From Swiss-Prot:
Organism expressing this protein natively: Polynucleobacter asymbioticus (strain DSM 18221 / CIP 109841 / QLW-P1DMWA-1)
Protein's recorded name: Adenylosuccinate synthetase
Binding site for IMP: D21, E22, G23, K24, N46, A47, G48, H49, T137, R151, Q232, T247, R319
Cofactor note: Binds 1 Mg(2+) ion per subunit.
Binding site for GTP: 20-26, 48-50, 321, 347-349, 429-431
Family of the protein in this entry: Belongs to the adenylosuccinate synthetase family.
């Protein structure tokens, strides 16, 4: 019996353990072969998941990666903030490539909408901050979450009640335009244009809108395997990340339940994705950093090499990523927060050819030794990394599919990561293609 015909389903959550960009899209794509549904539960179109299938590169920002598999249903949960404009742009790109999208995409009626004034606020705020800017993508994600918490957000279901929508939109714009013009010195957002654009999306969205919580419950009762796809990474989590240099949502495994409407007991296997090194986009502390394109003091040649070989540029923004050695002490913090079942190490091949490879196993902070990342950006910024050094390997790991075929030095490096982290490595990604993967423990199987 194939995994898609199991009588009893099993659910897997895929979480980034670093600052995002860990390679979750490729791993989700691989795991989707064993799932009937893929669920996005937080974030918006501020993070791109890059998939390479054959010679085709696809970047998904909002739609779950499972859309590339023709028999898989994709859900956007209540924890997501959704830009209708970005959604239909992405749908158009996928349909132009021959994919059936709208019959397989299901959107929660409780999903918060991103509207033009959220984008305007995002840009105006970053401009006013100047050198102290957070480094947002400028897509309105943060302001939309702010409206949600302030209980003034417009949600997908509101589009189907035009009079109520128009009234709430007018109130929202009175508030946001006051802030835009009087505090930020920016242009106001036009009410009539915003209303007309929003209403134009209502009928197009309606066939895709469902009660996602009930749909997922029914799928579980039918014995289906569900895959929950996280965006960003644990160290960008609004509560547990390097605050305030974080995103505006909870990126941790626990939010897979709240952000999609399932119970915590539905999250049976938590897979944490980590690169074999570290990257970060935008501002914020980074203890093991080697290279920052924008910082003349951070131009270590190995960091430059990691960026070039790893093609470390944001898939949505195109911004160069900062690079550094793998931080196992930060990984331990992610393991604590997420309750990880296993690890997936990605981009191991980027380390090929290095004479020495370093692993951060702790920090010196104000005269004390720590073995786990502290909380708060101020403390993290003062951390001095403690490294263990490992001999590199001469051969290539690119495309290897069996553990035994890895260079011994690579095996030793990976085993030490397991020891420091205290969790087993379930998978190793050795290239961008779906089948360039070493499987040690199958997340969908006991």
């Amino acid at each position: 019996m194939s995994s898609k015909q199991q009588a009893q389903g099993r659910n897997v959550v895929v979480i980034g353990t670093q600052w995002g960009d860990e390679g979750k899209g490729k791993v989700v794509d691989w795991l989707t072969d064993h799932a009937q549904a893929v669920v996005r539960f937080q974030g918006g179109h501020n993070a791109g998941h890059t998939l390479i299938i054959g010679d085709k590169k696809t970047i998904l920002r909002l739609i779950p990666s499972g859309i590339m598999h023709k028999d898989v249903i994709c859900y956007i949960g209540n924890g997501v903030v959704l830009s209708p404009e970005a959604l239909f742009k992405e749908i158009g790109e996928l349909e132009a490539a021959g994919l059936d999208v709208q019959s397989r995409l299901k959107i929660s009626e409780a999903t918060t909408l991103i509207l033009p004034y959220h984008v305007a606020i995002d840009h105006a705020r970053e401009k006013k901050r100047g050198e102290a800017k957070i480094g947002t993508t400028g897509r309105g994600i943060g302001p939309a979450y702010e409206d949600k918490v302030a209980r003034r957000a417009l949600r997908v279901q509101d589009l189907f009640y035009p009079e109520k929508f128009a009234e709430q939109l007018r109130e929202n714009l009175e508030y946001h335009n006051f802030m835009l013009t009087n505090y930020y010195g920016a242009e106001p957002v036009n009410y009539e244009k915003t209303l007309a654009e929003a209403m134009s999306y209502a009928e197009r969205l309606k066939p895709m809108v469902v009660d996602v919580s009930s749909a997922l419950y029914a799928a579980e009762q039918a014995g289906q395997n569900l895959l929950f796809e996280g965006a960003q990474g644990t160290l960008l989590d609004i509560d547990h990340g390097t605050y305030p240099y974080v995103t505006s949502s909870n990126c941790v495994a626990g939010n897979a339940a709240a952000g999609s409407g399932v119970g915590p007991d539905s999250l049976q296997y938590i897979l944490g994705i980590t690169k074999a090194y570290c990257t970060r986009v935008g501002a914020g502390p980074f203890p093991s950093e080697l290279y920052d394109h924008d910082n003349p003091a951070r131009q270590d040649p190995i960091g430059v090499r990691l960026a070039e070989v790893g093609k470390e540029f944001g898939s949505v923004t195109g911004r160069p990523r900062r690079t550094g050695w793998l931080d196992a002490a930060a990984l331990k913090r992610s393991i604590q927060i997420n309750g990880l079942s296993g690890l997936c190490i990605t981009k191991l091949d980027v380390l090929d050819g290095l004479e020495t490879i370093r692993l951060c196993v702790g920090y010196n902070l104000d005269g004390k030794k720590l073995d786990v990342l502290p909380r708060g950006a101020e403390s993290v910024a003062r951390c001095e990394p403690i490294y263990e050094d490992f001999p590199g390997w001469k051969g290539t790991t690119f495309g290897i599919r069996e553990w035994e075929k890895l260079p011994v030095e690579a095996q030793n490096f990976l085993r030490r990561i397991e020891e420091v982290a205290g969790k087993p490595i379930a998978m190793v990604s050795t290239g961008p293609e779906r089948d360039e993967t070493i499987l040690l423990q199958h997340p969908f199987q006991d």
